[in-house]
């Protein structure tokens, strides 16, 4: 029997993705202070954050498989997480519109039964629509972008503001299902173990 699958995230979108893929996770929020970490580049930062979140939660379980994730958006050399306020979200959208961003999601999967941790980062290019200020104001006013890395939710209203994606769509939502499958297989698990 496989270990309990634990999602070290408060993200409803990540939980929903797992459930749609047939995995019913136990949710254990890490409450890790993301501002306590810094890194030289976006990939290193999302992996460090994912690993820290997974590690914080994994320490509470003796025999679980713990997944931590973190996403950041890189546009024109600037890295963005969740916007701190509506004003920041509006300014960010005014910068992002008509641009192509790179959405990075770090994944850390800790197997407490094997004392192993695997990390991998997904990259998806996001082509933002050249939306007008009224649309930006309305979108930010909906509240949706305030809880999302990059100030948009692909699976919500924000999906209407994206022209196209190059890469994995679930990565943009916060958890690349292909990466998760690969990490599980590298640890010796089959997908059917969790269905």
From Swiss-Prot:
Enzyme class: hydrolase
CDD domains: Maf
Single biological process term from Gene Ontology: nucleotide metabolic process
Listed InterPro entries: ITPase-like_fam (IPR029001), Maf-like (IPR003697)
Keyword Hydrolase annotated: yes
Gene3D superfamilies: 3.90.950.10
Classification via SUPFAM superfamilies: ITPase-like
Active-site annotation: 70 (proton acceptor)
Keyword Cytoplasm: yes
MF GO annotations: nucleoside triphosphate diphosphatase activity
Catalysed reactions listed for this entry: a ribonucleoside 5'-triphosphate + H2O = a ribonucleoside 5'-phosphate + diphosphate + H(+); a 2'-deoxyribonucleoside 5'-triphosphate + H2O = a 2'-deoxyribonucleoside 5'-phosphate + diphosphate + H(+)
Location in or out of the cell: Cytoplasm
Main localization (coarse): cytoplasm
Keywords, ordered alphabetically: Cytoplasm, Hydrolase, Nucleotide metabolism
Function: Nucleoside triphosphate pyrophosphatase. May have a dual role in cell division arrest and in preventing the incorporation of modified nucleotides into cellular nucleic acids.
Protein family according to the UniProt entry: Belongs to the Maf family.
Matching PANTHER family: BIFUNCTIONAL DTTP/UTP PYROPHOSPHATASE/METHYLTRANSFERASE PROTEIN-RELATED (PTHR43213), BIFUNCTIONAL DTTP_UTP PYROPHOSPHATASE_METHYLTRANSFERASE PROTEIN-RELATED (PTHR43213:SF5)
Protein name: Nucleoside triphosphate pyrophosphatase
